[in-house]
């Protein structure tokens, strides 16, 4: 199973971070959101990724081009212009990076990577800026069992503000950022 990850949007709500990098490259715990998403899939044995690059996509390409170097212990001999790798840390991933355009929308990005998934029985398709605790193995099994064209993971959006319950002029309950209005949204 391959995973197609959307990583081309502008990320306007994180403008202080995304003025220099795409939103999937914003770091959590010293690693890009994109890395965390890929680790989640990899934990379920899914290691073949197609990244739909767009806005500042070169930063994603540079990240993966230098990934092995950054994850390994190395010695550089400046005199000989050589490098010796001591401890190698690598992921079992295959990562295909496709420039899908700066202004493409979801369908356009999927269309531009269609040649890379055309021989797949099914594939996973997710956003490059959302983390979850979805059991990927169970999700794929569910999809295969039901034999539909698509399976959508739904979630309740978090509320944006704390909610107060007031009786008379007294606060009787406070709930910090309750789940949204009860409507499910597409979680990827």
What are these regions (language model features)?
Residues 64, 131-188:
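Conserved core of the sugar-phosphate nucleotidyltransferase
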Residues 110-122:
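Active-site nucleotide-sugar/metal-binding loop of Leloir-type enzymes
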Residues 47-48, 121, 149:
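Short acidic/polar active-site loop segments enriched in Thr and Asp
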Residues 65-93:
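Short mixed-charge
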Residues 101-108:
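A short, glycine-/small-residue-rich helix N-cap motif at loop->alpha-helix starts
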Residues 120-131:
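Short beta-strand-to-loop acidic/aromatic patch adjacent to the donor-nucleotide binding site
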Residues 10, 102, 128-130:
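Active-site metal-binding loops of divalent metal-dependent hydrolases
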Residues 1-66, 97:
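N-terminal glycine-rich phosphate-binding loop and ensuing alpha1 helix
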